Amino acid sequence: MSPRPLGRFTAAGSGLLLAAALVACTPHPSPEVAVRSFLLAWQDGDHETAAAYTDGDPAQVSAALTDMREQLDLASLRFQLGPISREGDSAEAEFGVNADLGIGDPTWNYTGRMPLEWGPDGWRISWSTSVLHPDLSEEERLAVSYESQERGQILDREGQPLVTADSVTAFGVYPADMEDKETGVTQLAELLDEDPDPLLNRVRSAPPEQFQPLVLMRGSSVDGTLLGEASRISGVDTQEVQVNLTPSVSPFLLGEVAGTAEHRVSSRVPGSYQAGDTVGLNGLQNIFQHELAGSGTTQVVSLDQDGQVTDVLEAWEGSLSGAIDTTLDLEVQRAAENALTTVPGNGYLVAVDTGSGEVLAAASASGSTADDNAFTGSYLPGSTFGMVTALAALESGAATPESEVPCGYSAEIGGRTFVNPGGGALLDQATLARNITFSCDVGFAGLGAEVGPEAIAETAVRMGVGADWQLPVPASSGSVAVEDGEENVAAAMIGEHGVRVSPLSMALIAAAVADGTWNAPTLVPEEGPNPIGATTLDDAHLEVVRTGLRDAVLNRMPELLATGGEVHGQAARVEQGDTSLHWFVGYKDDVAFAVLAEADPATTLVSQHAVNAAGSFLDGMANGVPEEAPAGTATGEQVPGGPTTTEGVGLPSEQTGPTNQADLTGTEETGW
């Protein structure tokens, strides 16, 4: 806190300080000298010297000045000399008080008054407790009262709460019952592994008869031994309260409240927060801390000898806490989290509304608050990126809806041999839509030279890749930077070079294909429309992609049709480092979604985990899931409501859809 105007009359001279040293032995020639000397000594904390300028008992006056500083737990005290009125041997001085109540508390400014009388020793302050504050009587003391707000909820789009209210034990003290405040608070802090200083600051200035909550711990983490040890400290007590702490879904997105990880709400918090307050550590809990927590009401009060409030001398009203509305849909979110239990390793699922880009669900298999790769991950999209490059081919004129896009068994391009996932080929009717249907990498790679890196990048940008989405939480829109060279451009056409995406960015691409317009994502409606405008796409070109995606599900992933309705989508596997990425990106009705499973490459020939999770997700949306999803199944154990097959898409062991043997040579289909 920067020095206030007291510096003005402190600077009025070092001569005043010298005068203060002499005045104790010589009569004060004017009331102003007495007032200045008294205020300077009081401000500097030299209470014995200050008491000498009064007509009161020096020990009692010094104690009263010391008590005021401790009762308010002052960080600093500054004064301004006001007008002095004099009538004969009497005078009255006004002075401005600037009392800094400490970190997290406001500054108390008020006007004080002190009467003076001329006597044998010159001018002296006529002492009474009203010198401390005009409204303070002899039998009263000062205190600071602090009342915090109940933490607000985070709600889904239908107003359903997304944060669980936990039973919390508040460890605190009744200051009046403590034999020694510093010793008792320090013992409690050591017992609970906390820093004692912020707790002491709270206790020193608090009304002594009121319970002061200092540290919160989840009820499940408090046992009889801990309660017993705490109860042996004089003045310590506990109370049970309910606090909105734990995210019931999407931990990385909602975030945790301070102390969640260690089952304790820490007093070591930044900003205008007190010991015992709740503070969001990450996610929406952190971003919207002020809205969710509000701010406490602080009052400077006078207390009688029984510790009862006699008057409120100053009050600073806090701001009310409130709820945060999100675009999440609790039922869709539960379906997403339940679906990821089919993934043996880590995985992500993001669902958005096709017409608006509003985020309906964001889930990670790990369930960790630190695992936000559903939004921030940087992954190769594999052939799911064909949704983008197919449009680039159409927009650049490299292909038309009716033109043939040859898809042989393999193609040598720039030193790399491109093959189809299943080793097959399209021998006739090799349109662009059918290349999409059967994930024909050879056909897409062959278009690269005509499409070119600029067209790929331009189309990707129009579908939000690389844009600044301006969500309240960290998110990656991906990037596209295709290097020159036939091989690089061909690899970019199948999402294996120069492009990185997140599951969120792919879900938005699927939404654009479904709706005809790309929309920036929205998570918290109150933030207003996203400044990034919508991008309208060519509907005739989109129809080619939609046809390919619809037929891909019909021919290669019929298990996704179990819940009825029209499902569109593409599946892919791509190696990134030592991880096999399994993708499914598609949409049904007004929900677009992207599933990414990070798998051991050794499991590639066993199961297409993203498609299995997609099937479970669609089933969960259609039929619902339990409120608490079953634990993850690391062994691939089937979750009730999930798909009934563990085979991958298009495995040659079983024909999964109507195919024409003349179209596909070498395998039943080109899917995998």
Where in this protein do the model-derived segments appear?
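Short, basic/aromatic recognition patches
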Residues: 134-148, 152, 331-342
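Conserved SxxK-family serine transpeptidase/carboxypeptidase catalytic domain
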Residues: 26, 80-82, 210-231, 237-256, ...
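Conserved, well-ordered alpha-helix/loop/beta-strand core segments that scaffold catalytic motifs
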Residues: 305-347
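Secretory targeting and sorting signals
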Residues: 2-27
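Beta-lactam-recognizing serine transpeptidase/beta-lactamase-like catalytic domain environment
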Residues: 304-313, 345-378, 382, 392-599, ...
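Exposed beta-sheet edge and beta->alpha loop/turn motif
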Residues: 86-146, 548
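Small/polar-residue-rich segments within soluble enzyme cores
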Residues: 96, 117, 124-128, 132-134, ...
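Short solvent-exposed beta->alpha transition segments
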Residues: 30-33, 47-94
